[in-house]
């Protein structure tokens, strides 16, 4: 009974990790496209600002939005790495996190 419970738990954890991995893969792709678009928008706004066709507020808004999209992309990549680690652990990998006060 204990063995069956452990097997069910391992299967459930593996399934959850795979679902998370698949979901983050799609979201990372979308975030990359969005980040590229915001980067282009920032470059266009910078050009318009240098030519006197955009205000400083518009330029700073473009910068803020581009940085927010880059931050979101980094967070999604972190989430994806975390999902890979969860999958590795669920599949029986020997992952041991270091305690905060331990030295590597």
Each model region followed by its residue ranges:
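Amphipathic alpha-helical coiled-coil segments
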Residues: 1-72, 79, 83-90
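Terminal intrinsically disordered/low-complexity segments used for targeting and assembly
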Residues: 89-104
């Amino acid at each position: 009974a204990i063995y069956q419970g452990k097997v069910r738990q391992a299967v459930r954890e593996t399934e959850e990790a795979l679902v998370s991995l698949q979901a983050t893969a799609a979201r990372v792709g979308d975030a990359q496209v969005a980040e590229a678009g915001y980067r282009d928008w920032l470059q266009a706004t910078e050009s318009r600002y240098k030519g006197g066709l955009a205000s400083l507020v518009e330029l700073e808004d473009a910068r803020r939005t581009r940085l927010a999209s880059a931050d979101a992309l980094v967070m999604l990549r972190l989430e994806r790495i975390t999902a890979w680690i969860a999958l590795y652990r669920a599949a029986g990998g020997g992952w041991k996190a270091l305690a905060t006060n331990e030295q590597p």
